From Swiss-Prot:
Coiled coil regions in record: none
A Gene Ontology molecular function term of the record: tRNA binding
Gene3D superfamilies membership: 3.30.1440.10
Tree of life domain: Bacteria
A GO CC term assigned to this protein in UniProt: ribosome
Organism, as annotated: Vibrio atlanticus (strain LGP32)
SUPFAM superfamilies in the cross-refs: RL5-like
Disulfides per UniProt: none
Name assigned to this protein: Large ribosomal subunit protein uL5
Amino acid sequence: MAKLHDYYKSSVVAELTKEFSYTSVMQVPRIEKITLNMGVGEAINDKKLLENAASDMATISGQKPLITKARKSVAGFKIREGYPIGCKVTLRGERMWEFLERLISIALPRVRDFRGVSAKSFDGRGNYSMGVREQIIFPEIDYDKVDRVRGLDITITTSAGSDEEGRALLAAFNFPFRK
């Protein structure tokens, strides 16, 4: 079991129960899934870019990504419905906890000029979304084999009912919010 998951069960549940005065442990918010998304708009012209992005995503997450396709045709972007334009991975269970641990303790501190992540990126229902500008902050990515620097979106879906509860849950994991 991941260290962060043990920490959640032993400390965070008790801490949040006390802070929000929950009557049952099942009311305590928990992280349900983490979704990683990488949009590769340039893949229209060169399919190799999407394959490289998918292999980077697989290296970061530890599981094979799903290739996302365009939902509708947009002439301005020169895409047709069904064109492959990105990839995504949904992490749950053990892989999710391990990824969150690596994100908080290794990857985010490696971002250049890192001052913390915005505390305003909650969606109103306790879910948190953030963007990473370069995939090379993850130690699994070999810098010499990267064809181009790509960013990715990370969404942390929680069972929290409000932003305040979601923020308290992530703060309990020492998530580096900007002061």
